[in-house]
A protein has these predicted regions:
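Cytochrome P450
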Residues: 1-417
Length: 417
């Protein structure tokens, strides 16, 4: 163990000199500068969470993958001591909304049964069948951008393309009325903002729960041709989900299905605009779009970390994580690890970046990753072909970055051509 590791509390559990987590990102694209030092000095170190409790930060690519695949870690957010970047009481943990107990917040065998019910809806083959509709949606949104530009003012790419594309896709897939987008998009913004007071977070979660409670009840009585209806019908036979879990799962799928991809589209477009040689390579060979999507997922890593709690003592990188201690697997650090990616701080759309951990790793790896990849592929191969003169309409330093959110991105992206 190095002196630096000791100074930041690798072995201490309650030291007052622990660094605080979360740490500020470096806009527009880079993770906190502290991560690079951690990877060198000690890829398994301790930090203080907003709750006032310490947790283990895992920063190396190898170590992040190892911890996320370890059966001795739990994703059960209701456990006391589970790390969180918002203050939460044990009573609030017990009253967590349904999506906290569905899929992302469960362990085997409960998690296994839930995932098995859903995985067939997101296979490569199933997602490939959606491609024509995704292409149609992307082209329609670009048509709208081109029409709006007749007014000779900048167009907000977030509002006109990045958010509508995945929102409409996931709404049609789930069977959620797209007309309700202002309701769920607005409440998603509240939930992912770190500074949202606990009372407001609970109130918004309850509004979403009530919305999906009504939707699931309606689909139970009158099923349609959509994922939620198929899930309800299948559940009649298997009884894997309670009604409350179905409500929570629907909430999770909708929120995760539009917010994450929307931010990669917007921030990825900005990254390509700020790296003209990479944009030119993509324009010259649109078949680079899938590789570009993987590299942008790695380079940007908009979801900073995955949170777990140890259920048994774990030895890793010379440290002992004891049962009951919180763990923060820093995907944003792992994806900039030079031992896994050459020149990790450079954007290179021709590198092989498929082994990134932007979608997580292990049994909780993102269920909708094939859909996200398809959406990113279609957007990036279409946008620059149809609007070759696309450019940023303001200085990059004037953009409103989501420094205050669980999911990184930009609130607005004014573009012109």
């Amino acid at each position: 163990m190095t002196d630096t590791e000791q100074s930041i509390g690798t072995t201490g559990a309650t030291g007052t000199d622990l660094p605080e987590f979360p740490m500020p990102r470096r806009p527009p694209f880079d993770p906190p500068s502290e991560y690079a030092r951690m990877r060198v000095d000690g890829p398994v170190t301790r930090a203080m969470m907003p709750s006032g409790e310490p947790a283990w930060l895992i920063s190396g690519h190898e170590h992040v993958r190892r911890i996320l695949a370890d059966p001795r870690v739990s994703s059960d957010r209701t456990q006391p001591g589970f790390p969180s970047i918002v203050r939460i009481t044990d009573e609030q943990r017990r009253r967590m909304s349904g999506f906290g107990r569905s899929l992302i917040g469960t362990d085997p065998p409960e998690h296994t049964a839930q995932r098995r019910m859903l995985i067939t809806e997101f296979t490569v083959r199933k997602v490939a069948a959606l491609r024509p509709r995704i292409e149609q949606i992307v082209n329609e949104r670009i048509d709208a951008m081109l029409a709006e530009k007749h007014c000779d003012r900048p167009v907000d790419l977030v509002k006109e393309l990045a958010l509508p594309v995945p929102s409409l896709v996931i709404c049609e897939l789930l069977g959620v009325p797209y007309a309700d987008r202002d309701f769920f998009q607005g409440r998603t913004r509240v939930l992912i903002r770190r500074s949202t007071p606990p009372e407001e977070r609970e109130a918004v979660s309850e509004e979403l729960r009530e919305y999906f409670d009504r939707l699931i009840t309606a689909k139970t009585a009158d099923p349609g041709d959509d994922l939620l209806s198929r899930l309800i019908e299948h559940n009649r036979e298997t009884e894997v989900f309670s009604h409350e879990l179905l409500v929570g799962l629907a909430t999770l799928l909708l929120l995760a299905g539009h917010e994450t991809t929307a931010n990669v589209i917007a921030l990825g477009t900005l990254a390509l605009l700020e790296h003209p040689e990479q944009r030119a390579a993509l324009a010259n060979d649109p078949n680079l779009a899938p590789a570009a999507a993987e590299e942008l997922l790695r380079y940007l890593t908009i979801v900073e970390a995955g949170f777990r709690i140890a259920t048994a003592d774990i030895e890793i990188a010379g440290a002992t994580i004891k049962a009951g201690e919180g763990i923060v697997a820093l995907g944003a650090s792992a994806n900039r690890d030079a031992t896994a990616f050459g020149r990790p701080d450079e954007l290179d759309i021709e590198r092989g970046a498929r082994h990134h951990v932007a979608f997580g790793y292990g049994i909780h790896q993102c269920l909708g990753q094939n859909l996200a990849r398809m959406e990113l592929d279609v957007v990036f191969r279409t946008l620059f072909r149809r609007i070759p003169g696309l450019k940023l309409a303001v200085d990059v330093g004037d953009l409103p970055f989501k420094d205050d959110a669980f999911i990184y991105g930009v609130y607005e992206l004014p573009v012109s051509w």
